[in-house]
Amino acid sequence: MKIIFMGTPDFALPTLNALVDAGHEIVAVYSQPARPAGRGKAPRPSPVEKRARELGLNVYTPVSLKEAETQKIFADHQADVAVVAAYGLLLPKAILEMPRLGCLNVHGSLLPKWRGAAPVQRAILAGDQESGVTIMQMDRGLDTGAMLKIEKTPIADKNAGALSDEIAHIGAKLMVEVLAQPEQYPPVKQPESGESYAAKIDKSEALIDFSKGAVQAERQIRAFAPKPGAFFLYNEERIRILEAHVQNQAGAVGETLDDHLLIGCGSDSLQPVIVQRAGRKAMKLEDMLRGFAIPRGTRLS
């Protein structure tokens, strides 16, 4: 099958690789333009652009798909289908209708729940028991298109990085299955109830609110790990917590209850396990405390 692939971050790589391994003809790869990154702020290509060039594929990085010339180039590929995985740009109606089989999206939630940009993080924050992947036929709405195939996976104690990686690989498998026998997966309209919106994550949400209890704080930590990393402030320094456990011990909100950084959250408490000081690598809590003590009774903000 002649495929246009559209994706940008690491999440999209398993699907691109799976399509290549399945023997499909990738006639073009679309990704967002290179962004300034690193200390020198030199333009850095997206993970998908980098991988596509390694594979010798034709790569396009338009800032928009609305221009007539950009749409003509897209149409000239005469693709059977466009496969989209976390591309990040709006697909106009003209683009959606160009491929013979339309545009299929790998979405990281059980639609109609968590439509939008951050379904993995929002599912963890909400305390959902399960997540998954929906292969959907794209339309002009925000993740409102008909569903072709769904697979669930338990969230358990996974953080956003681990869950996203798992979902990405499930999505790659499902997309290959759908394209192998498209007639076996007729589109099914999404339910009219149960929808929710997964707003893009804002870094301001990463400050841990211990007043909401240890259970919610632990969800917040998993939802923001590994990036941007949920954090607290100590002497005006941001200290990220990348892994933590809930403890039954009650304690004053935001106060350290011992010399091992057990943090009070009202009726329960939070025990950090993996932490990261500003500008340093992540490490076990005990390694940080050897040279950076935070004494009992400290009030964290």
Swiss-Prot record:
One of its GO terms (molecular function) is methionyl-tRNA formyltransferase activity. The keyword Protein biosynthesis applies. GO terms for cellular component: cytosol. Its EC number is 2.1.2.9. Keywords: Protein biosynthesis, Transferase. Belongs to the Fmt family. PANTHER family: METHIONYL-TRNA FORMYLTRANSFERASE (PTHR11138), METHIONYL-TRNA FORMYLTRANSFERASE, MITOCHONDRIAL (PTHR11138:SF5). This is Methionyl-tRNA formyltransferase. The lineage of its organism: Bacteria, Pseudomonadati, Pseudomonadota, Alphaproteobacteria, Sphingomonadales. The gene is fmt.
